[in-house]
From Swiss-Prot:
Part of the elfADCG-ycbUVF fimbrial operon, which promotes adhesion of bacteria to different abiotic surfaces. Could be involved in the export and assembly of the ElfA fimbrial subunits across the outer membrane. It comes from Escherichia coli (strain K12). The gene is elfC. It is found in: Cell outer membrane. GO terms for cellular component: cell outer membrane. This is Probable outer membrane usher protein ElfC. Belongs to the fimbrial export usher family. Keywords: Cell outer membrane, Fimbrium biogenesis, Membrane, Signal, Transmembrane, Transmembrane beta strand, Transport. Induction: Expression is negatively regulated by H-NS and subjected to cAMP receptor protein (CRP)-mediated catabolite repression. It comes from the Bacteria. SUPFAM superfamilies: FimD N-terminal domain-like (SSF141729). It is a multi-pass membrane protein. The operon is cryptic under classical laboratory conditions, but is functional when constitutively expressed. Coiled coil: none annotated.
Amino acid sequence: MYRTHRQHSLLSSGGVPSFIGGLVVFVSAAFNAQAETWFDPAFFKDDPSMVADLSRFEKGQKITPGVYRVDIVLNQTIVDTRNVNFVEITPEKGIAACLTTESLDAMGVNTDAFPAFKQLDKQACVPLAEIIPDASVTFNVNKLRLEISVPQIAIKSNARGYVPPERWDEGINALLLGYSFSGANSIHSSADSDSGDSYFLNLNSGVNLGPWRLRNNSTWSRSSGQTAEWKNLSSYLQRAVIPLKGELTVGDDYTAGDFFDSVSFRGVQLASDDNMLPDSLKGFAPVVRGIAKSNAQITIKQNGYTIYQTYVSPGAFEISDLYSTSSSGDLLVEIKEADGSVNSYSVPFSSVPLLQRQGRIKYAVTLAKYRTNSNEQQESKFAQATLQWGGPWGTTWYGGGQYAEYYRAAMFGLGFNLGDFGAISFDATQAKSTLADQSEHKGQSYRFLYAKTLNHLGTNFQLMGYRYSTSGFYTLSDTMYKHMDGYEFNDGDDEDTPMWSRYYNLFYTKRGKLQVNISQQLGEYGSFYLSGSQQTYWHTDQQDRLLQFGYNTQIKDLSLGISWNYSKSRGQPDADQVFALNFSLPLNLLLPRSNDSYTRKKNYAWMTSNTSIDNEGHTTQNLGLTETLLDDGNLSYSVQQGYNSEGKTANGSASMDYKGAFADARVGYNYSDNGSQQQLNYALSGSLVAHSQGITLGQSLGETNVLIAAPGAENTRVANSTGLKTDWRGYTVVPYATSYRENRIALDAASLKRNVDLENAVVNVVPTKGALVLAEFNAHAGARVLMKTSKQGIPLRFGAIATLDGVQANSGIIDDDGSLYMAGLPAKGTISVRWGEAPDQICHINYELTEQQINSAITRMDAICR
């Protein structure tokens, strides 16, 4: 049961907690009356002496002075939820919210425009209506909303989605550890195949100390026939530089790919952080699409490093949740099918035309050493600087430079906002390079980008671009190669089996590159997308080509999708083509359902079908069933059966996933080639967070996280999450918070134990990047008691206020027959009851509850006030 303790409670004659209708009506009337109102005590009791002092209500006061947790609404928009101190301004003016200049400024009121604010202390209560004409402050007691209204001219002019830096929270000091373990045990019955086991562990550890974030990403892997290997992928120290709207990084990171190709480095970088901008000023992230012909492992790499790995079912897939390390630069996508075959292709990614709003400056400065995972490249020092400036008339000017021992490059560009015709940008890069054979080269590269959304047609040209480079143009990465040609091998690769996708030849420099990304909404008929790229090279006719098409629609409950994928890379003997048809049909109406409404919302069941055909005419077909179980929908299973026309073999899989409060677990089994190849796979992921209040286990961490602290509210669900609940101490970690944005963190009051009440069920936080922000919930674990009070055999006065000693927020009001309802009471304590300001207008109730009374839904008892 949820109850706000800062709001006093009354009892109806039936004993159910509520406000006495008569008092509320008359208090409300008094609050809104223009003339002074007087309460006749005889209205409430025949004996006026049995009524408490109601003079405060005669002045229109609905509440007593104190701190109340309220929603703050500015011009009909909720801007914050926090504790506000209500004080008595003067006996004549009564009680009002104490709003300071500092708090009003944080809400978005333009206090600088009114000189009177500067004459007040920043912590002094502001008479808002006296300073800003037509301003008003109203407290809605029933909804606990502090409603502030000011003229629009007194509001700061901010972009949509803007959150002022004053509300950004650096978080608490903590030690963080995220882990992800996966393993597979394979059995191959054929003589030419080896059975084997493989294991992979990814550890993301870190320390938060004030605004500083220390992070390390390491992996451990072991396969049959190979020794175990640890890899340190990256380590860095990072912090936000709020005055510069930027971020300082010391250690391993990537440069942005807006101007020059993105490269991995180890060094120092100071760069603008677009996350600090409102959503309306931010760009887009890459989406990786493809088609799997079987239960496949998807690996996404950048600069030789694995940045993303997952398993997908047969059919079309889409990955849109890549980490920020892969926010620029081309991505290598590898699809490893169940039979061991690997299909790989490159997904180009560039930002939309590099436009900035007028006056906006975006910068990046890097002093570092080139970092690579390839044994074919050296690690040399380099420097890079870039700058963008939003000019007048919808223009953006940008440029940058790169400097290394064997490389010099400078670029300059200009972007235009063409209004209804979209946005374009054009830039040129001049480079001088010295290659591995000591040959010197000079060249230029020209790039054109275009983006446009046709709202009335539902068409989005998310990105159309073309780059042309002369034969003498090379990139910084090209000058890092130790040889003019060869095969790249990353640490741990089998050098006896080179892959065509790893071959490089500096003689074949890049020439022209065209890329297109178009999506179209068709209303009730669905939507389709078309994306493609083509890279040509000097001194060869070979090309890299990627073309993807997809159409998705909904026919009543049936979801239908069609997709086609074509990829051909330089050096690849033949192109890969896959056509796929998939559909899913919900089965909820056919399966037994829970009567619980909460469970019904969380449980789903659907049938899936995937059919794919490759360019050689081989067909794979899969039919599956997927269902979510348990009250929170955090247990799911999937069963699939398939057929492959190549070899006329059957395949199948079964898996189960459990998303728990302290970890996520998965186990699966699949077979192929009529059972001659079998595999058992399993995974476990989660986190451990050490902080000043203890150690908390949780689900996998995101970049930014929230620590819920609700002592007394153990095993309570977190709203809008799956499987997440507080531990035995009332703590849990909510992962994947959005940095520099308002995050609404809420506990599900319906899952509270019956002897627990929450003072606040919702906390709003605005974390900085990488922060672990504390969201505190005040839970009162204790008994709910209905007391029949008396003093010297006479019921206590109607309207008297009762307060639990030591807990000012926990209080109640005596009703018309002397009854008092209070919740969250400890087993033993003292309640003070006051019906006036005189020293003799107070008495005390000493009580002691049994264990049975504490655990009861409500306890009724007589109480003597002395």
